[in-house]
Amino acid sequence: MSSLPVPYKLPVSLSVGSCVIIKGTPIHSFINDPQLQVDFYTDMDEDSDIAFRFRVHFGNHVVMNRREFGIWMLEETTDYVPFEDGKQFELCIYVHYNEYEIKVNGIRIYGFVHRIPPSFVKMVQVSRDISLTSVCVCN
């Protein structure tokens, strides 16, 4: 299966019931601290607000945050990282009424409460140390 370019940008329109599905594989051993980053931008510009950032430090922890008016807010972290070294993953981010629900390979790992409405999100960007197989949005 062919890979998508990384970073990968996708124009989106999110609402309650939407789901962003990302499939890929880490390209480095976990010993080298590879990362995966997913950003939900409020415009097609990388300088715009980020309604949700999900950054995985494979084999270590996950950091979630948002950026408003150029200022990063208080980050949330979890040490529960069910990714496997060298193995393909499926990351699903579900848009619920009050939160983004994050699942990896069908396992819920976190819920990030909305601070910026999902309807403001205009672009999803996937970046960092992964071979990206697919990115899609289901509405």
Swiss-Prot record:
GO terms for molecular function: carbohydrate binding; lysophospholipase activity. Detected in adult and fetal spleen, fetal kidney, adult urinary bladder and placenta. Placental expression originates predominantly from the syncytiotrophoblast. It holds the Pfam family Gal-bind_lectin. The gene is LGALS13. Keywords: Apoptosis, Cytoplasm, Disulfide bond, Hemagglutinin, Lectin, Nucleus. Changing residue 138 to S: Loss of homodimerization. It comes from the Eukaryota. Residues 6-138 form the Galectin domain. This is Galactoside-binding soluble lectin 13. One of its GO terms (cellular component) is nuclear matrix. InterPro entries: ConA-like_dom_sf, Galectin-like, Galectin_CRD.
